[in-house]
Amino acid sequence: ILNDQVQQSLKAKPMEEVDRISLSKYFAYIDLDHVSEYCYVDNKKNLYTRSYSKIPYQYFEDSLLVQQLGSSYADTRWFVMKDYLFGTGEEALFVGRKVHSLNYAHEPGYLFFKMNPEFLQSLLLEEDTLTQEAAIGIMDPQGRICAYWYPEGFTLSPEQEAVLADYAQTQGYGSLVENEKISGGILSVYKQEECGFSVFTLVPERVLGK
């Protein structure tokens, strides 16, 4: 965002072709672990993507990614939606924000990262040890479970799914509930303020009875 070439792309004067190529290379060489695709769009409808594919601007508009940012000036937003930009049509985790010029009052650009499935798994350390007994999952702000690690033979009941969705949509952040007895086990839920995603841990009754 603070890169000189990124800032130059937001000026009123269009960039020279050599500068646009240089900006494409800048994005290409950034260390983007866990990012499967990215898309930077300047305020003159030029797209820069990881695959160097010629994605038309209309595809970007039709993808509805910008609408997910709402009226936020420059907040980073995490959201799960179907990928209509890169052609998969499957649900994926995106991280996006508006990119503003630091010196001029121009229209913003947009930067979106499409994260690969392993990204959410990397957020939980020692998952193999934890999931031998407890069920662990990550939910988006709407309560949809984006990633999970369950003990062998474990599945959530519809009642448990409803309880989790209610907590995910609850206002407030931090520890929403800790060691609460619900049907089928003991539940804890922590909601991250920066992204609105929640992590839950459910210890099944069969473990409590050991």
Can you say where each PLM-predicted feature lies in the sequence?
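Juxtamembrane segments flanking the first transmembrane helix
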Residues: 1-2, 6-10, 14, 25-28, ...
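Solvent-exposed, extracytoplasmic
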Residues: 20-34, 110-153
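Short, hydrophobic beta-strand elements of compact beta-sandwich sensory domains
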Residues: 94-98, 102-117, 179-210
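Generic short beta-strand
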Residues: 38, 97, 135-138, 143, ...
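Extracellular/periplasmic ligand-binding regions of membrane signal-transduction receptors
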Residues: 1-21, 37-54
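Amphipathic coiled-coil signal-relay and dimerization helices
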Residues: 41-53, 143-149, 188-190
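Extracytoplasmic/periplasmic sensor domains and loops in membrane signaling proteins
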Residues: 14-25, 52-84, 149-178
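Extracytoplasmic/periplasmic ligand-binding sensor regions of membrane-associated signaling proteins
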Residues: 37, 43-116
